[in-house]
């Protein structure tokens, strides 16, 4: 018997049969959501989604897809969600999203993408969520994300990014969450965050940052969470203090120089230090291995 046979008039189709190797046929036109996940599916025919004019969600995670046909999504202009997590994709056809201008949620996490093509994003003005984590990206072309004016969350964590191109975030006025954790970033340009004034959560932990440009976080007046843990920072930059809850700040695992500039900044902004126990001074010698928070509020700092 063929695994996972479609039911007539059903609106949702789910198949997680490990032996499935061909995309199911005969799905009813009433289908709104398809989940074919954790299977042996390695290829899709160009007509896989033909006759499904109402399809809004397509979940294809944890299969063995190494390529997608350029015309795959042409029959489904109503698509809102596409999840391709944990496949073997090393590239996508340039025009794959040309007809899916209603797409809101695109997940490409856990593939083998090395290069981003700006053409992918040209028609995705309604996209709100883009997950490109855990690929092999070494760069993001300038302006690649410029059409994504509705984007609220961008995940580029666990790639191979050593620098961020000037203008990489241009056009992302609605962006609230940016994850750059686990890359190879050694430095950031002073104007990096100017295009994203709505940012609320910024994750930069587990990079190779040695210094931050003066005022780099000044445009981020709505920032609630800033994670700089496990970099190589000795001096700190922070966004301006804003009304409302204190900034959640993780600066653990850095070799902090507990000089007057750092201590005065922490006193002024008064962030909520996450993992304060692992946030230690590396210098000067008299403060070495003491908690930054303790030194900041001690009365013996000569500042």
Residue spans of the language-model regions?
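Membrane-proximal C-terminal cap and juxtamembrane stalk of leucine-rich repeat ectodomains
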Residues: 1, 6-12, 201, 246-303
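Structural signal for repeat-unit boundaries in curved repeat scaffolds
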Residues: 7, 28, 38-41, 52, ...
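LRR N-terminal entry segment and analogous cap-like coil->beta motifs
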Residues: 8-57, 61-64
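Conserved LRR concave beta-strand detector
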Residues: 12, 33, 43, 57, ...
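Consensus "Asn ladder" position of solenoid repeat domains
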Residues: 18, 39, 60-63, 84-87, ...
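Leucine-rich repeat
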Residues: 21, 42, 66, 89-90, ...
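Recurring C-terminal helix/loop segment of individual leucine-rich repeat
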Residues: 22-26, 46-50, 70-74, 94-98, ...
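Ankyrin-repeat and related helical/solenoid repeat scaffolds used for protein-protein interactions
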Residues: 186, 197-261
């Amino acid at each position: 018997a063929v695994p996972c046979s479609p039911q007539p008039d059903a609106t949702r189709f789910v198949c997680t049969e490990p032996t499935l190797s061909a995309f199911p046929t005969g799905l009813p036109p009433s289908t709104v959501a398809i989940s074919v996940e954790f299977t042996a599916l390695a290829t899709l025919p160009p007509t896989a989604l033909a006759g499904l004019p109402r399809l809004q969600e397509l979940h294809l995670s944890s299969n063995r897809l190494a390529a997608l046909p350029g015309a795959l999504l042409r029959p489904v202009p109503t698509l809102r969600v596409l999840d391709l997590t944990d496949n073997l994709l090393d590239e996508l056809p340039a025009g794959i999203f040309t007809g899916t201008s209603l797409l809101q949620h695109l997940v490409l996490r856990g593939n083998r993408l090395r290069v981003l093509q700006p053409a992918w994003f040209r028609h995705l003005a309604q996209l709100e969520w883009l997950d490109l984590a855990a690929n092999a990206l070494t760069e993001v072309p300038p302006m690649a994300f410029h059409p994504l004016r509705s984007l609220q969350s961008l995940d580029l964590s666990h790639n191979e990014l050593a620098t961020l191109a000037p203008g990489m975030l241009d056009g992302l006025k609605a962006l609230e969450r940016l994850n750059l954790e686990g890359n190879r970033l050694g430095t950031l340009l002073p104007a990096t965050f100017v295009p994203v004034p709505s940012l609320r959560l910024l994750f930069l932990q587990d990079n190779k940052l040695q210094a931050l440009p003066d005022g780099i976080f000044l445009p981020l007046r709505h920032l609630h969470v800033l994670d700089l843990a496990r970099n190589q920072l000795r001096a700190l930059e922070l966004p301006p203090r804003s009304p409302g809850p204190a900034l959640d700040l993780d600066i653990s695992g850095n070799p902090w120089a507990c000089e007057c500039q750092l201590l005065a900044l922490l006193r002024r902004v008064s962030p909520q230090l996450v993992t304060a126990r692992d946030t230690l001074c590396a210098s000067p010698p008299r403060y070495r291995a003491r908690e930054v928070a303790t030194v900041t509020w001690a009365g013996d700092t000569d500042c």
